[in-house]
């Protein structure tokens, strides 16, 4: 169901099918988050569902407003009809959709759910979530920004949101002692890079964002998978208890070190490019 929801989101040609995709992702994510039935996982799953339901309600309001204003939900048709509407109407519609998609993408200040939810799930589930779930939200923002609202009315807002997401995410990561929570905050920070690229409203900015999305899917997924191996080897994900792990398991250390360098943008890795 999760894979079908992701595929449908990337292939959707109208807002309603995109909404259905988001709901498929929500249902599958809740099951995967709460697998095992521990109190922490159930709490994280309920928190994630409540935040996602708020996003769904806002998205539904945006869909209703879009249909009322244009008479269609097809993205290509809307792109044409929105050109004839007053700027206030299009800006309001874009703002509503941005809030809905921003929650899915974990854009600050709508990102607080992510660091609380991801670390509680099993490592393979967290890896899939890190690689795909937030990227669906970023993709939805790209579709809305480039196809329906190319005028750049809210570019300044997007740019500020991107900058704040970068800063808050990395400051949150610095304060963590659990490596899974550290990576979760780092994930939020890197979402900010993607949003900033979209806000530039240039072909170079958009192509850079798409490249960075692909890079981040590969690197962040790898890191969460390796952290799962580290947790299994050491019995904990706390940095305080992982001292000497490199000497005890040099292969794991290398497996973590290489994608970490990549994520940090160290040349010649793809994160630097």
What are these regions (language model features)?
Residues 1-16, 29-273:
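Hydrophobic transmembrane alpha-helices and their helix-loop junctions in integral membrane proteins
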Residues 20:
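Short, ordered loop/turn segments at secondary-structure junctions
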Residues 23:
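Short phosphate-coordinating micro-motif centered on Lys-Gly-acidic
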